Protein backbone atom coordinates (compact mmCIF):
# COMPACT_ATOMS: atom_id res chain seq x y z
CA UNK A 1 0.00 0.00 0.00
CA UNK A 2 1.42 3.36 -1.01
CA UNK A 3 1.75 6.29 1.35
CA UNK A 4 -0.89 8.18 -0.64
CA UNK A 5 -3.43 5.36 -0.34
CA UNK A 6 -2.76 5.06 3.39
CA UNK A 7 -3.43 8.78 3.82
CA UNK A 8 -6.62 8.52 1.77
CA UNK A 9 -7.80 5.60 3.89
CA UNK A 10 -7.01 7.55 7.06
CA UNK A 11 -8.91 10.59 5.82
CA UNK A 12 -11.91 8.43 4.93
CA UNK A 13 -11.83 6.88 8.40
CA UNK A 14 -11.64 10.28 10.07
CA UNK A 15 -14.44 11.57 7.85
CA UNK A 16 -16.64 8.60 8.69
CA UNK A 17 -15.99 9.10 12.40
CA UNK A 18 -16.88 12.80 12.16
CA UNK A 19 -20.09 12.07 10.29
CA UNK A 20 -20.97 9.30 12.73
CA UNK A 21 -20.29 11.58 15.68
CA UNK A 22 -22.41 14.37 14.20
CA UNK A 23 -25.30 11.99 13.58
CA UNK A 24 -24.97 10.62 17.11
CA UNK A 25 -25.02 14.03 18.78
CA UNK A 26 -27.88 15.21 16.57
CA UNK A 27 -29.82 12.15 17.66
CA UNK A 28 -29.04 12.87 21.31
CA UNK A 29 -30.28 16.46 20.98
CA UNK A 30 -33.46 15.48 19.13
CA UNK A 31 -34.12 12.70 21.60
CA UNK A 32 -33.55 15.02 24.53
CA UNK A 33 -35.99 17.59 23.14
CA UNK A 34 -38.62 14.96 22.41
CA UNK A 35 -38.25 13.31 25.80
CA UNK A 36 -38.34 16.62 27.71
CA UNK A 37 -41.45 17.72 25.82
CA UNK A 38 -43.13 14.36 26.37
CA UNK A 39 -42.64 14.37 30.12
CA UNK A 40 -43.48 18.07 30.42
CA UNK A 41 -46.73 17.54 28.51
CA UNK A 42 -47.65 14.68 30.83
CA UNK A 43 -46.83 16.78 33.90
CA UNK A 44 -48.90 19.69 32.58
CA UNK A 45 -51.83 17.38 31.87
CA UNK A 46 -51.67 15.96 35.39
CA UNK A 47 -51.51 19.43 36.95
CA UNK A 48 -54.44 20.63 34.83
CA UNK A 49 -56.61 17.65 35.78
CA UNK A 50 -55.81 18.10 39.47
CA UNK A 51 -56.59 21.82 39.33
CA UNK A 52 -59.91 21.33 37.53
CA UNK A 53 -60.86 18.60 39.98
CA UNK A 54 -60.12 20.92 42.90
CA UNK A 55 -62.46 23.46 41.26
CA UNK A 56 -65.16 20.80 40.84
CA UNK A 57 -64.95 21.26 37.07
CA UNK A 58 -65.02 18.62 34.32
CA UNK A 59 -61.48 17.62 33.39
CA UNK A 60 -60.10 18.09 29.88
CA UNK A 61 -59.40 21.09 27.65
CA UNK A 62 -62.82 21.60 26.04
CA UNK A 63 -64.71 24.75 27.02
CA UNK A 64 -68.51 24.26 27.02
CA UNK A 65 -70.45 26.38 24.53
CA UNK A 66 -73.01 28.84 25.86
CA UNK A 67 -75.26 30.96 23.68
CA UNK A 68 -74.20 34.18 25.39
CA UNK A 69 -71.59 35.46 27.77
CA UNK A 70 -71.87 38.45 30.08
CA UNK A 71 -69.01 40.41 31.56
CA UNK A 72 -68.81 41.66 35.10
CA UNK A 73 -67.35 44.86 36.46
CA UNK A 74 -63.86 44.49 37.93
CA UNK A 75 -65.23 46.01 41.13
CA UNK A 76 -67.50 42.99 41.54
CA UNK A 77 -64.53 40.64 41.81
CA UNK A 78 -64.10 39.50 45.37
CA UNK A 79 -60.74 38.93 47.04
CA UNK A 80 -58.64 36.33 45.23
CA UNK A 81 -56.52 34.05 47.34
CA UNK A 82 -52.79 34.34 46.79
CA UNK A 83 -51.43 31.24 45.03
CA UNK A 84 -49.65 28.61 47.06
CA UNK A 85 -45.93 28.38 46.43
CA UNK A 86 -45.05 26.09 43.49
CA UNK A 87 -48.68 25.04 42.95
CA UNK A 88 -50.83 25.49 39.84
CA UNK A 89 -53.55 28.10 40.42
CA UNK A 90 -54.82 29.11 36.95
CA UNK A 91 -54.97 28.05 33.30
CA UNK A 92 -53.79 30.04 30.29
CA UNK A 93 -55.35 30.19 26.83
CA UNK A 94 -53.97 32.06 23.81
CA UNK A 95 -56.19 31.39 20.77
CA UNK A 96 -53.57 32.65 18.29
CA UNK A 97 -51.17 29.92 19.40
CA UNK A 98 -53.78 27.58 20.79
CA UNK A 99 -51.95 24.44 19.72
CA UNK A 100 -49.31 25.22 22.34
CA UNK A 101 -51.15 27.34 24.92
CA UNK A 102 -54.60 25.98 25.69
CA UNK A 103 -55.59 25.26 29.28
CA UNK A 104 -51.89 25.37 30.13
CA UNK A 105 -51.36 25.37 33.91
CA UNK A 106 -49.87 28.45 35.53
CA UNK A 107 -47.69 27.72 38.55
CA UNK A 108 -46.54 30.00 41.33
CA UNK A 109 -42.80 30.44 40.78
CA UNK A 110 -40.40 30.47 37.85
CA UNK A 111 -37.97 27.73 38.84
CA UNK A 112 -37.32 24.61 36.74
CA UNK A 113 -39.88 22.57 38.68
CA UNK A 114 -42.68 24.91 37.65
CA UNK A 115 -41.47 25.78 34.14
CA UNK A 116 -41.02 22.11 33.23
CA UNK A 117 -44.72 21.50 33.93
CA UNK A 118 -46.30 24.62 32.46
CA UNK A 119 -45.96 28.37 32.77
CA UNK A 120 -44.52 30.18 35.78
CA UNK A 121 -45.81 33.26 37.59
CA UNK A 122 -43.23 35.71 38.91
CA UNK A 123 -43.95 35.64 42.68
CA UNK A 124 -43.17 39.34 43.11
CA UNK A 125 -45.81 40.32 40.54
CA UNK A 126 -49.56 40.62 41.01
CA UNK A 127 -52.30 38.06 40.30
CA UNK A 128 -55.38 38.41 38.05
CA UNK A 129 -57.91 40.86 39.42
CA UNK A 130 -55.31 42.85 41.33
CA UNK A 131 -54.04 46.26 40.36
CA UNK A 132 -50.59 45.71 38.88
CA UNK A 133 -48.66 43.48 36.51
CA UNK A 134 -49.50 39.76 36.25
CA UNK A 135 -46.18 38.49 34.88
CA UNK A 136 -45.55 35.05 33.39
CA UNK A 137 -42.56 33.15 32.00
CA UNK A 138 -42.63 30.10 29.73
CA UNK A 139 -40.09 28.00 27.86
CA UNK A 140 -39.68 28.54 24.14
CA UNK A 141 -37.57 25.46 23.49
CA UNK A 142 -37.99 22.02 25.09
CA UNK A 143 -39.78 21.19 28.37
CA UNK A 144 -43.22 21.71 26.86
CA UNK A 145 -42.18 24.89 24.98
CA UNK A 146 -45.52 26.71 25.42
CA UNK A 147 -44.14 29.93 23.93
CA UNK A 148 -42.36 28.30 20.98
CA UNK A 149 -44.46 30.37 18.55
CA UNK A 150 -44.43 33.69 20.37
CA UNK A 151 -43.33 35.28 17.09
CA UNK A 152 -46.84 34.62 15.73
CA UNK A 153 -48.56 36.85 18.29
CA UNK A 154 -50.03 40.14 17.11
CA UNK A 155 -51.31 43.34 18.65
CA UNK A 156 -54.91 42.95 19.90
CA UNK A 157 -54.62 39.16 20.23
CA UNK A 158 -56.47 37.89 23.28
CA UNK A 159 -54.81 36.19 26.23
CA UNK A 160 -57.25 34.52 28.59
CA UNK A 161 -56.64 33.42 32.17
CA UNK A 162 -59.01 30.98 33.84
CA UNK A 163 -59.25 30.92 37.63
CA UNK A 164 -61.67 29.09 39.90
CA UNK A 165 -64.36 31.78 39.66
CA UNK A 166 -63.47 34.02 36.72
CA UNK A 167 -62.14 34.38 33.19
CA UNK A 168 -59.78 37.34 32.69
CA UNK A 169 -59.43 38.53 29.09
CA UNK A 170 -56.37 40.59 28.17
CA UNK A 171 -55.56 42.26 24.86
CA UNK A 172 -51.92 42.33 23.72
CA UNK A 173 -50.61 45.81 22.98
CA UNK A 174 -46.83 45.85 22.72
CA UNK A 175 -43.78 43.61 22.45
CA UNK A 176 -40.07 44.19 22.90
CA UNK A 177 -36.83 42.19 22.89
CA UNK A 178 -34.66 42.91 25.92
CA UNK A 179 -31.68 41.61 27.87
CA UNK A 180 -32.28 39.08 30.66
CA UNK A 181 -31.20 41.76 33.14
CA UNK A 182 -34.19 43.96 32.19
CA UNK A 183 -36.23 43.09 35.27
CA UNK A 184 -38.27 46.27 34.81
CA UNK A 185 -40.47 44.43 32.30
CA UNK A 186 -42.44 42.80 35.14
CA UNK A 187 -42.84 46.06 37.04
CA UNK A 188 -45.52 48.75 37.21
CA UNK A 189 -44.63 50.56 34.00
CA UNK A 190 -47.34 52.54 32.21
CA UNK A 191 -45.81 52.12 28.78
CA UNK A 192 -47.28 54.53 26.18
CA UNK A 193 -48.02 51.57 23.91
CA UNK A 194 -50.47 50.21 26.48
CA UNK A 195 -52.78 53.13 25.69
CA UNK A 196 -53.72 53.62 29.33
CA UNK A 197 -54.88 56.97 30.66
CA UNK A 198 -54.13 58.17 34.17
CA UNK A 199 -57.67 57.21 35.17
CA UNK A 200 -57.48 53.68 33.76
CA UNK A 201 -56.75 50.90 36.26
CA UNK A 202 -53.30 49.39 35.78
CA UNK A 203 -54.19 45.73 35.24
CA UNK A 204 -51.58 44.33 32.89
CA UNK A 205 -50.34 40.90 31.82
CA UNK A 206 -46.74 40.29 30.76
CA UNK A 207 -45.51 37.24 28.84
CA UNK A 208 -41.76 36.54 28.86
CA UNK A 209 -39.72 33.90 27.04
CA UNK A 210 -36.27 33.37 25.53
CA UNK A 211 -35.06 34.91 22.27
CA UNK A 212 -33.84 33.54 19.92
CA UNK A 213 -35.55 30.20 20.22
CA UNK A 214 -32.48 28.07 20.94
CA UNK A 215 -30.73 30.63 23.14
CA UNK A 216 -31.07 32.40 26.47
CA UNK A 217 -29.21 35.48 25.25
CA UNK A 218 -32.28 37.74 25.23
CA UNK A 219 -35.93 37.86 26.27
CA UNK A 220 -39.01 38.41 24.12
CA UNK A 221 -41.68 40.26 26.08
CA UNK A 222 -45.35 40.94 25.33
CA UNK A 223 -47.58 43.24 27.37
CA UNK A 224 -51.37 43.26 27.38
CA UNK A 225 -54.12 45.09 29.24
CA UNK A 226 -57.22 43.71 30.93
CA UNK A 227 -60.24 44.13 28.66
CA UNK A 228 -63.00 42.12 30.33
CA UNK A 229 -63.83 39.75 33.16
CA UNK A 230 -66.41 36.97 32.88
CA UNK A 231 -67.91 34.82 35.61
CA UNK A 232 -66.79 31.24 35.27
CA UNK A 233 -70.28 30.14 34.30
CA UNK A 234 -70.07 32.10 31.03
CA UNK A 235 -66.74 31.63 29.21
CA UNK A 236 -65.56 34.42 26.89
CA UNK A 237 -66.62 34.04 23.23
CA UNK A 238 -63.04 33.56 22.00
CA UNK A 239 -62.86 30.19 23.76
CA UNK A 240 -66.08 28.53 22.66
CA UNK A 241 -67.67 27.23 19.48
CA UNK A 242 -71.24 26.08 18.86
CA UNK A 243 -71.85 22.35 18.89
CA UNK A 244 -72.32 20.95 15.40
Residue ranges and their predicted role:
Residues 1-5:
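Juxtamembrane low-complexity tails/linkers enriched in Ser/Thr-Pro and polybasic
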Residues 6-244:
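Solvent-exposed, non-transmembrane regions of membrane-associated and secreted proteins
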Amino acid sequence: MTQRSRKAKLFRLIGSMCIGGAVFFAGVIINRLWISNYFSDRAAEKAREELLTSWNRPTGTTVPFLSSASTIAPGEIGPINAPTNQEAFALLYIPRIGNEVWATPIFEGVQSKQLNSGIGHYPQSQIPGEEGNFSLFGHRNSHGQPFINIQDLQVDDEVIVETKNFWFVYSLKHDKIVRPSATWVTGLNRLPELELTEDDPFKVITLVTCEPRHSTDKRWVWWGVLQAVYPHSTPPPALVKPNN
